Every structure is written in structure tokens, then in C-alpha cells.
UniProtKB/Swiss-Prot annotation:
The keyword Transferase does not apply. Transmembrane segments: none annotated. Keywords: Acetylation, Chromosome, DNA-binding, Nucleus. Residues 41-114 form the H15 domain. This is Histone H1.11L. GO terms for cellular component: nucleosome; nucleus. It comes from Gallus gallus (Chicken). Histones H1 are necessary for the condensation of nucleosome chains into higher-order structures.
Amino acid sequence: MSETAPAPAAEAAPAAAPAPAKAAAKKPKKAAGGAKARKPAGPSVTELITKAVSASKERKGLSLAALKKALAAGGYDVEKNNSRIKLGLKSLVSKGTLVQTKGTGASGSFRLSKKPGEVKEKAPKKKASAAKPKKPAAKKPAAAAKKPKKAVAVKKSPKKAKKPAASATKKSAKSPKKVTKAVKPKKAVAAKSPAKAKAVKPKAAKPKAAKPKAAKAKKAAAKKK
């Protein structure tokens, strides 16, 4: 009988072991609940900065000191979160939501950009304008092709040089006419020769005078009969 009694005690020991495992499983849930409690309840630093800058009516932008005052008035702890404010300003400037009008880094004045959408649209236009200079490069070969035409125009210029030679020949051809005009007085000499012919005509009239002699001879022959 004494040998069989320890068996139930051995079975009770393993049954008590699963209880710590359940407690370990419950602990992660508590840790998750602690993580939820750490999340800040409210807007982020960047949202607070953008609201404060948009609320300001200054044309030159909101300074860092004025921004801290606006955040402190909204219940934000500026002294503890000073580094977060500076990082938030730098990130907003890099994204393009804010424009830094004065100063460098986190110090200076800031204002909202006019329209974030317009900034994105202007960037592609600049790329298109950068692509436009490639077109003039294509036009340059055409201009180079037009240059040989100018060389052809230079070849045509000798024709102009030939024209003066032709005009010189025409002038030389016209010059004999002037010589002929100088020879015209010879025609006047030829015109005098008809006058001599007129002087010869009276000689031809002498045979007419011979006719009366023939008539006298006929009369003499008639008398002899």
C-alpha cells in the first residue's frame, strides 16, 4: 500500500505548471496598452506650424519667435519641444509647403507657399523648356545646308563680270559707226560728180545741130534734080 500512494502527488505537480504560462501570455497585452498611452493625443508639430503660419497676416512671413509664441498660446510646450519645432520647419521647407523668406536653417521668417500644386506643375514646364533647346540643334544642319547656296551665288558673280566685257564689245562695235559718220563727207564728193555729168549733157545736144546740115544736104540734092 505504501508504494502506490506517491503516484497522485506526481500527477498534481504537472497540473500546477500551466498557470505561470497563462500569466506570461497576459503581460504582452499590458505592454501594448502602455504603447497606446504613449501616442500623443492631438495634431503633430508640422500641422501646428502650418496653422500658425497660415493664421499670420504678415507679408514678409512669420518669424521663429512669433511662431513659438503662437504655439505656446495654443497650449503647446515650446521649451520641451524646441528641437521638434526646428525639425518640423526644415521638413516643411524641404517639402515646399513653407517658404523661408529670411535667415537660414530653422531661424528666420517663414510663410506658406502660394499653391503647392502650382509648384509641381511648374517643374515639368522647366523640363519641357530644357528639352526645347534640342530643336535648334536640329535646325543648325539645315542652316549649314543653306550655306552652299551662298557659294552658288558667288559663282553667279562672274556673269556680272562678263557683262562689262560684252558692253565693251558693243561699244567697240558702235565705234565703227562713228568712223562711217566721219566718212560721210566722201558722199558729198560723190554728189559733185553728177554736176560734171550735167555739164556733159550739152555736148550731147550738138548732134541735134547736125540735123539742119542733113536737111541742107537734102535741099541741095533736090535742087540738082
